[in-house]
Amino acid sequence: GQAGAGGVGDPIEVISPIDGSHLTSLADGDAALVDHAVTVARAAFDNGRWSKMPPAGRKAVLHRWADLVQANAAELAVLGVRDNGTEIGMAFRAEPGSAAATLRYYAEVCDKIYGEIAPTPDGILGMIHKEPVGVVGAIIPWNFPLMIGAWKLGPALACGNSVVIKPPESAAL
């Protein structure tokens, strides 16, 4: 995937809820920008690099992502405190660790989602064929965005889908 610059209208000013200081400015989006993001995500899905990757490959990528979340847990916790005012103890205890655990859970799901079928009569072939469906839109809330983002991204990516994320304006970092 990739982050898109784009944006329309006035930028969204990211203000620290702690002291009111200006953290950064982000591009604002509109329906056309969302449509473009979905088109790009669909093209990425259709090229098959992720959607047709063997489950073991997706599993390895999700585990690597969890490793990176854990390795950068302190920085991510501080970012959550500065961005949306998460209480510092909660930020360190809950969010990065929960996000990493969620990503690891779905990494392990990658090669275990094939299920079983009920017995069928002689001469009848029963099958389950599971495949990614395409592009998933994930709207991330302001409260615990890293953790809840992992709840949405983990299952979608584990199944081979592409994802377009809509972060909250009040916790967009």
Model-inferred region functions:
Residues I15, M53, C159:
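Single, functionally critical "micro-switch" positions that shape active/binding sites
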Residues G1-L26, A60-R64, I113-I139:
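Terminal low-complexity tails and localization/encapsulation signals of metabolic enzymes
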Residues E116-L173:
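Conserved small-residue-rich beta-alpha loop and adjacent elements
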